[in-house]
């Protein structure tokens, strides 16, 4: 779950980090009201969970509440990288002296927490890694040891602060807060970019990003609730898929893909691409899918406006071919048939039974996945 | 013998009375696996498919000499199940369970490693070794009937079955197939699994099945280039068409912070002389060429 900036900032604040005063608004009137309350120039920040909002026009400075109102009328409803702006975070404008980068992730290779720190900030870490890789410091923290004094010291020194100054202490407490948020909230990412030194000399997270592990959401009911009320970057199809129990990712082609297992489904997409086609989606029915899951999954693609051909690639083990065929039959019955072409390749458990069931529906079963993929691509072109 | 399991591997199934645990215990027994005990707290004293059930792993180990464990416990309790197995003294733990919070996996896996225990998974199909008729996992039995000299290490389940099937059809036999798991943090990662199987004198060739996310494939390529592995290898990487920032079914299959895309993995393999199959179906052909058959 990707937290909005205002939610992430609230977390930082909860952990004792000083943040610029601000509130989130859902209407231009509210934006004006908050701007009046804060007083002076304010920043309007579109709350969409993508990087690079600024360049896309999602961050604006307003000198007066009236200007804030005007800007907000344009910003609400704006489409930024596929996401519609429904919330605007209005915060006090602060003059910035210096920008840094600080993030915390889980390092897969060492199985430790990893801080990435750079005295240059405001741009993506990819950008820094490309242009000035020597500026990135990596500090690993073993989860069984936890964050220690010396970890914090090496990060804060690297960011350019002098020991035992007020700024040093502020920066240290931000490092500590980020670590605590990471652990307490089961986060995959805690980032402050830019982390800034203001004209007044305060160290503050000017922007904040937190991504919480979806598998741990049950431990944080308040976040679960927030996600339900505001699904952020999850499409309607993806929400539906999650409810039924399969994985769905939207892509932009016209060949609908259904597979079982993440790896095989990705390989099926790649196969379609290999033969010159374009996958419309990734849809993994998972292991041991029942006919109901197959039915609901297929219905999604039958109704999908962009999908011309549906290519199912099932390698049965726990998943049974007859169960899959029954799901196909039920989906077609509920939809009253379809004009879309369906290409099925199925191997494994109860294959023969599945073949007979599909034959009755006039759907031929392919033994060879390459042949089936070629056929699907050919039909999509026709 | 294989590197991870052999004739003396005695298995305890944690979560044996659940739907999955019970179903796959039967399949493991049918395959020939020595499943000696099961564990479900509160169900001690019962049996599942003739296998005695205990309340603790410690008891299963004490009474039956179990030295390996397969975990089918629900996600909320699975990390604890790993810790329990480690403390009970087993040497190998296979975690089938999906959706374990990654911070919990992190702690459990680190604890196990500090005690010298090998963890496969979580979110994995497990491992199967046809030469010793032993399976700790959920792979379909019928594909793993032909023992031989090819090791398959993979981040995916069904794709492992698919490629194993293609290998067997092409006349190869399997020494061991290990699905290391689709989560971002796993006990034994793809690179370590390849390194382990390479140490087996019975293994002639290694098939590596990678996917988007992380850098295990790149690390493996580096190990190969440095000579840590000196056996013929063939790779396949799933997810060439996966868009950045989206999880492709597996929690670990995500292109993030500018790294982990299929292209860089494929390039890393090719740069060190490991051929990469364009499709899963090309793997046997490439392996035959590697082994000069």
Swiss-Prot record, chain A:
Cofactor: Mg(2+)
Domain of life: Archaea
Binding residues for ATP: 45, 52-54, 94, 99
Enzyme kind, highest EC tier: ligase
Catalytic activity: succinate + ATP + CoA = succinyl-CoA + ADP + phosphate; GTP + succinate + CoA = succinyl-CoA + GDP + phosphate
HAMAP family the record matches: Succ_CoA_beta (MF_00558)
Record family assignment: Belongs to the succinate/malate CoA ligase beta subunit family.
Stated name of the protein: Succinate--CoA ligase [ADP-forming] subunit beta
Species of origin: Pyrobaculum arsenaticum (strain DSM 13514 / JCM 11321 / PZ6)
